[in-house]
């Protein structure tokens, strides 16, 4: 456990700390962090999503475990959304973002890189499956947000608009490559690897910059609610669901529980 903390979590913390200090020293600004996050969301994350999807062994996924996670995620999402709407009196679009931030884990840029170095393929597959679901769930949320923002826009046009969502396209492309058994040229594979490897360091550095910014009291209260749901309640709820089913080995659920207790996901940060 100590080795896991030192070898896997410490590098993540160090990179966030470097971003934090560089912002406090005015080397980087909040605007710089937004530009970095935009690169991560538009370029690096789609490449990483495609790379991860191509690595999954679908036949080896424990779908009972995945559906347990999805069920817990939906409960957290709806509960946090309703608290944002009716206790903090937020607008519906803001409440949806609170729900996303409280339930979406940073599995892509936090859990996956750590797990890749510490666990075998059987424990990596659940993370990849959850990433695939969350990309779809993200698109559903974006459709709802667009319906709220563009009330005069037809649902058909909003649906078509989602195909400009690069992580979704990466997911579809990855599944198509797997199903059609397409061989990727070495040059493309190396470029994909090169871009994908930049996602986590850039996102973590930008997160450090953002953490250095001052928050209003209301924002702090909402942040505390998000932390409570994401870091504490979600893993507890998932563990309870897995325990209730009584047919899932907890040793196989280790990385899934890691995802449930991971920090807030990148996409909620981008769209907020």
Q: Residues of each region from the PLM?
A:
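Alpha-helical transmembrane segments of multi-pass small-molecule/ion transporters
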Residues: 1-272
